[in-house]
Amino acid sequence: MSTGNESYNLRYPKGFKGYPYNMYKLEGYGTPKGYITLIGVVATLTVSGLFFAKTRSNKREYPTHNKEWRAKTLAYAKETNADPIYQLPKDKI
């Protein structure tokens, strides 16, 4: 019985049983490897997204942002907003 391929006949003599009959099963043909990879990628991205969302929601304030700093910032904001150059005319609203 000839396979039609001379290099195959030279490499694997008649009766050679080193490889299974169905090479596709050996290589994983028919198994959902693509789906498993996709599930792994989605799971990794989901876990990392949840982790970073949690770390962003649990951010500590800066050590310099104390009560005095907040009060001065609010006073500056009120002073800036009171400046008429920042006020839109009523007809533009």
From Swiss-Prot:
Membrane disposition: Single-pass membrane protein
Q: In which pathway does it act?
A: Energy metabolism; oxidative phosphorylation
Mitochondrial intermembrane side of membrane: 54-93
Q: Where are the transmembrane segments?
A: 34-53
Quote the cellular component terms of the Gene Ontology held in the record.
mitochondrial inner membrane
Per the record, the similarity remark reads: Belongs to the cytochrome c oxidase IV family.
**Official protein name in the record:** Cytochrome c oxidase polypeptide 6, mitochondrial
Q: Which organism is it from?
A: Dictyostelium discoideum (Social amoeba)
